[in-house]
């Protein structure tokens, strides 16, 4: 719920206080404006989007953030990130999350995190339902995000498994 409220999900209403991000009051901003400002939410149950490829989704989101992206550079970085997550290249051409296992959906979310490099990443139970190997790979992707980018992470979890693998300031 916290992640959805921070991202401005329409089904939740803030009844008091403010949501400040980078010194700006975003309490009444739309979800897309929050995303453009640098916020990212990894869903506990990622949606399936038939007809929109994983690659197309990430490239479109990246272009919304930074403008034109050279296709060669994009493909090279996408391949690098997918390799870190041990995702077969064919996943890039598949419809977003359609037919993906739970672990594959989580990897796709972390792939988005690695490619979009948001200022604030809210990971909502990213490790939920994952086996030890999948948690290790997801954690590796989160570590890569931290290494490559000076962004903040808000990790919402019922387990400490992912926390054991990432660098953190406050727990």
Which role does the model predict for each range below?
Residues 18-34, 97:
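ABC ATPase NBD Q-loop/coupling interface
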Residues 45, 51-65, 77:
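Q-loop/switch helix immediately C-terminal to the Walker
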Residues 113-114:
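ABC ATPase C-loop
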Residues 117:
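Conserved catalytic motifs of ABC-family nucleotide-binding domains
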Residues 125-126, 133:
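Walker B catalytic motif
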Residues 156-158:
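H-loop/switch region of ABC-family ATPase nucleotide-binding domains
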Residues 169-170:
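Conserved small/polar residues in nucleotide/adenosyl-binding loops
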């Amino acid at each position: 719920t916290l992640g959805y409220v921070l991202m401005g999900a329409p089904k939740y209403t803030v009844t008091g206080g403010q949501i400040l991000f980078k010194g700006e009051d975003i309490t009444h901003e739309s979800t897309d404006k929050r995303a453009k400002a640098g916020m990212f939410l990894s869903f506990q149950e990622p949606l399936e989007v038939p007809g929109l490829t994983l690659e197309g989704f990430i490239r479109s989101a990246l272009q919304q953030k930074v403008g034109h992206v050279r296709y060669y550079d994009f493909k090279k970085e996408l391949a690098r990130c997918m390799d870190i997550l041990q995702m077969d290249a064919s996943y890039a051409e598949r419809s977003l999350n359609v037919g993906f296992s739970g672990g594959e959906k989580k990897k796709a979310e972390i792939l988005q995190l690695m490619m979009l490099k948001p200022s604030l990443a809210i990971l909502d139970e990213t490790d939920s339902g994952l086996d030890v190997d999948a948690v290790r790979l997801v954690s590796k992707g989160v570590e890569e995000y931290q290494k490559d980018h000076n962004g903040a992470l808000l990790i919402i979890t019922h387990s400490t498994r992912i926390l054991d693998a990432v660098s953190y300031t406050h727990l």
